[in-house]
Amino acid sequence: MMQNLPFEPEFEQAYKELASTLENSTLFQKKPEYRKALQVVSVPERVIQFRVVWEDDKGQVQINRGYRVQFNSALGPYKGGLRFHPTVNLSILKFLGFEQIFKNALTGLNMGGGKGGSDFDPKGKTDNEIRRFCVSFMTELCKHIGADTDVPAGDIGVTGREVGFMFGQYKKIRNQWEGVLTGKGGSWGGSLIRPEATGYGVVYYVEHMIQHASGGKESFAGKRVAISGSGNVAQYAALKVIELGGSVISLSDSQGALVLNGEEGSFTAEEINTIAEIKVQRKQIAELATQDAFSSKFKYIPGARPWTNIAGRIDVALPSATQNEVSGDEAKALIAAGCKFIAEGSNMGSTQEAIDVFEAHRDANPGAAAIWYAPGKAANAGGVAVSGLEMAQNSARVNWSREEVDSRLKKIMEDCFNNGLSTAKEYVTPAEGVLPSLVAGSNIAGFTKVAEAMKEHGDWW
């Protein structure tokens, strides 16, 4: 499928990861017609590309590229975030949209898959510049989205502030209030738990991994948890780990890693909140590293990721920054440090080489002796799940309580885990005592659900 495409390394990686999983299972033996479905689902239904012209504070005209990849609507309206970052290109958005199809399928909610964004960099921009950019971006995007067509959300570089600016422009142009974006403010249609959802969700997912692998004897209590990133996902994953009795031993950002000095202790909830405050101001964690309260307890390593810089044992790893942030060598280092569970809070957080290392170790070691890897499309589905719950609340013009949303999130993550587990057992036969492959189970479960819907719609035959 890749030979007639332009060079799109990120999308090619995502496609090959799914295709190899399906090939290495018994799915195509049992249902060979699904090979055709894979060819069809790998081509987006629509790709929208446009210019975004806006004025900076000096009165100068600035030009950026805007995109929306409407990948698949078999299960519902296109659903996926908007990313504002200078690295954004069509390959990255196609990879994210492709992953989003199957992630959304795993939630059990009626959502298709899509992704969008721009190569605009919000860092260093004033509020007025960001507002002017968002207005220009939405002026074009509004022609292609709607509550029953395509419902974007936030992603890297797109917080509640940007969602608000874009929602306001959509409302002005279309003269209607509808749930066309998720991640909205709580006072105007947003859902409680939405900012926390991805981070909380990945921890809830790993809870089930720990309980299954230990036969119900273990939990997060006493676990040393290495986390990368320091945005929403990392912050709320860290807070939930601390709440459940675990120790958070690292965070990071694009400039470097902040790791615990020594083998005892943890980030506290107050320290996580301090990091959250500087991130709202778009500052780097390096600025905290020199403060007395942090320098005595933590070590800052410029230009590094945390995985090979942590003293002592690592029980759980949660990559929560960006794609391909765990390499093959770092995967081996995590195993050497005693890591037993790795779940991606970020999308495609591990390179294919790293996934191969994790899966080979799981295949070669029975039960609790192995590292158990969970892919982002399953482990970080909590964010889009609560976006789906926000859509449901908007449609019904109701607001659910924090407890109601959190309860539904926990159930969705439990179902997501059990679905991947049972599907892996059905289509992939491991050696005696070996844990099932969650990457295989999640890929197959998401793919078969979408493929069946597409077949019934006449998209392939």
UniProtKB/Swiss-Prot annotation:
BP GO terms, sorted: glutamate biosynthetic process
The EC number(s) this enzyme carries: 1.4.1.4
Organism for this UniProt entry: Penicillium chrysogenum (Penicillium notatum)
Alphabetized Pfam families for the sequence: ELFV_dehydrog (PF00208), ELFV_dehydrog_N (PF02812)
NCBIfam families assigned: PRK09414.1
Alphabetical keyword list: NADP, Oxidoreductase
Record's keyword annotation contains Oxidoreductase: yes
GO molecular-function terms, A-Z: glutamate dehydrogenase (NADP+) activity
Similarity annotation: Belongs to the Glu/Leu/Phe/Val dehydrogenases family.
Active site: 115
Quaternary state and interactors: Homohexamer.
Keyword match Lyase: no
Protein name stated in the entry: NADP-specific glutamate dehydrogenase
GO cellular component: cytosol
Cited PROSITE patterns: GLFV_DEHYDROGENASE (PS00074)
Reaction it catalyzes: L-glutamate + NADP(+) + H2O = 2-oxoglutarate + NH4(+) + NADPH + H(+)
